[in-house]
Regions:
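Catalytic core of carbohydrate-active enzymes
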Residues: 1-196
Length: 197
């Protein structure tokens, strides 16, 4: 249970960014696989997995006592969020180990996820440094973004009191671009970079 809570708190910047996109652009936060992979008929009946955004695949255990779980991986490269395994899928089912203290979470190649060191609560988490998980494609490319405000005030986006950062990585270089109202952005400290691929 402790590891699940740590995972939840570490994913808050990514989830917060997804909710911002839902607010401003109508995107879905949690989505079925067929929404992201509509031409893959194998995804049409998958009802035991979900994506957060287009880049984070969650394969939970839904029955008590199970130590393994079967998950479908659409075509592409998928990295475990822990960085300890890689799945090069041609569109296939994979049997994953699922010990009690583990939630199977995989990052889709081509995505950059902002994370943060977990703490006792969300307010304390916000005081911790950010980390980036960079999941490179076989060609060496990834992109992601972060929307960050003070986490408490209303209408920070409308007032321009936020920081928005676009992260890009390629086999040649890495870079960021940011925006917010002049002099009002919320500071973001990057403390760690995890490169997958």
């Amino acid at each position: 249970m402790r590891n699940a809570l740590r995972l939840r708190y570490s994913l808050l910047p990514f989830l917060y960014t997804l909710f911002h996109r839902a607010h401003t652009a109508g995107e879905t936060v949690a989505r079925p696989l067929f929404l992201e992979f509509p031409t893959d008929p194998n995804t049409w009946a998958v009802d035991r997995q979900l994506l957060w955004g287009g880049g984070l695949l969650i394969t939970p255990v839904l029955e008590a006592g199970q130590t393994k779980v079967s998950g479908y991986f659409p075509v592409g490269t998928w990295y475990s969020l822990a960085g300890d395994s890689t799945i090069h899928s041609k569109g296939q089912w994979v049997l994953l180990p699922a010990p009690l203290d583990t939630i199977n979470v995989h990052v889709r190649a081509g995505h950059i996820l902002p994370l943060q060191e977990p703490a006792f609560n969300t307010a304390q988490s916000r005081g911790k440094g950010m980390a980036l998980v960079v999941a490179l494609t076989p060609d060496g490319f990834a992109r992601g973004d972060l929307f960050w405000d003070d986490g408490e005030s209303w209408e920070t986006f409308e007032r321009g009191d936020y920081t928005e950062i676009l992260f890009l990585a390629s086999n040649v270089s890495t870079g960021t671009a940011g925006r917010g109202a002049p002099g009002q952005g919320v500071p973001v400290a990057l403390g760690h970079l995890c490169l997958l691929g």
